[in-house]
Amino acid sequence: MFEGIGTAIVTPFKEGKLDIESYEKLLNFQINNQINAIIVLGTTGEAPNISLDEREILIKKAKEVSGNKAKVIVGAGSNGINHTIELIKNAEKNGADGLLIVTPYYNKPTQNGLYEYYKYISEHTDLEIIVYNVPSRTGINILPETVYKIASDCKNVKALKEANSSFEQINKDLLLLKELKDFKIFSGNDDTAFQLLASGGDGVISVASNIIPLQMVQMFNFIKNGEIEKARNIHFSYYKLFKNLFIETNPIPVKAALSIMGFINNELRLPLVPASESTMKIITETLKGCGVI
């Protein structure tokens, strides 16, 4: 499993179809700025709106561009086991280095149900698995104790992406899960990434690194080298950007930002729509304020 910064890459569209030219340009921007992993088909990649055929294209292109320079982790979670396994097999076939598996949304399983779900998945793939906790989207919060039990019993469950903003839960993750050998804890929120990393976390699965990959990598490296003040300076230099990338539903603001920067068209798939005029103004001012444009 990687450590460092993994970019939750957007999926560019042009007139309703995949925009592979823009996607490749964005991937090269990431690799050239030393990103450690590309997270394809996560929340930021609009995964629920992507067909199986399109998934193949996106995964293969990410592998082609990344080569041996960055891991390609594929979001392959759904709200039911059969569809999740289908997505996993698709990821395996197309060369994924690992899997990001979100807790099953809508069904609202118990903690025991979550344990059985991840155990079943673990038994049906040899790829390394990141458990993805994002209760604001799924309606369910997987507890640190449940993750500990899963990782203890499932040899290929290797990491947690924690997108619960509760510092109490983040601290419990760090206290409990660090007892596991070779288990990684990733921040799923850019605005609390500095705190998690400074407390012993292993990396960030980042939205902001679509825009500022090198700066996110530098922040991680400073913390790893014990240069906390330098990392803190980066964190607060871009804190407004971290917050404003969520003033509308992700990935609406980050796609707006990337369109302003000239990387992609400002296009999403329904039910998501482009940023409002007021949001576009805020994003433009934010990018100018932190020196991105």
UniProtKB/Swiss-Prot annotation:
It comes from the Bacteria. It catalyses: L-aspartate 4-semialdehyde + pyruvate = (2S,4S)-4-hydroxy-2,3,4,5-tetrahydrodipicolinate + H2O + H(+). It is found in: Cytoplasm. The active site is at Y132, K161. Keywords: Amino-acid biosynthesis, Cytoplasm, Diaminopimelate biosynthesis, Lyase, Lysine biosynthesis, Schiff base. Its EC number is 4.3.3.7. It is an enzyme of class 4 (lyase). Homotetramer; dimer of dimers. Belongs to the DapA family. This is 4-hydroxy-tetrahydrodipicolinate synthase. It comes from Thermosipho africanus (strain TCF52B).
